[in-house]
Amino acid sequence: DSTDGLLVKDKYLCGDLYGEEYGVIFPYLGLKTECLWTIKMDPLYRILLTVRDVHENCNKESLEIIEGPPESSNSRKICDTSHAEYTSCTNTMTVKYTRKPNHPAPDFFLIFRRVL
């Protein structure tokens, strides 16, 4: 399991706030169609986010990496990748997942780490 040794906080929540040094975010498997996970580190740190096994169809669902808090306009949409890494410019990063109603839940996971 590639999450061995990493903090796994209440798997499958639809949104949460993470402030730990590192951890894993799993997709939400319930009925909600939009989820926001915000990662916020101490001001001196940035965030390295590793995205694994994203195979979304962007017409029906999407995963968006937002630089900063949820209301920030600087974002990148991810549709299909087996592995990608993103480093924040600030100490805050938000991940937004949206899907159309009745579209099946995804099977991705995200690993975040605090970096200087």
UniProtKB/Swiss-Prot annotation:
InterPro entries cross-referenced by the UniProt entry: CUB_dom, Sperma_CUB_dom_sf, Spermadhesin
**GO cellular component terms, A-Z:** extracellular region
Localization per Swiss-Prot or TrEMBL: Secreted
Disulfide-bonded cysteine pairs: these are: 14-35, 58-79
Expressed, tissue-wise, as follows:
Seminal plasma.
Q: What biological-process terms (Gene Ontology) are attached?
A: single fertilization
| Domain CUB per the UniProt entry, residue ranges | 14-115
- Which SUPFAM superfamilies is this protein grouped with? Spermadhesin, CUB domain
Task: Provide this UniProt record's keywords sorted from A to Z.
Answer: Disulfide bond, Fertilization, Secreted
In terms of one coarse class, where is the protein primarily found?
Answer: secreted
User: What is the stated purpose of this protein?
Assistant: May be involved in the fertilization process.
Question: What family is this protein classified in?
Answer: Belongs to the spermadhesin family.
> Subunit structure, briefly?
Homodimer; disulfide-linked.
The name this protein goes by in its record = Spermadhesin Z13
Source organism of this protein record: Bos taurus
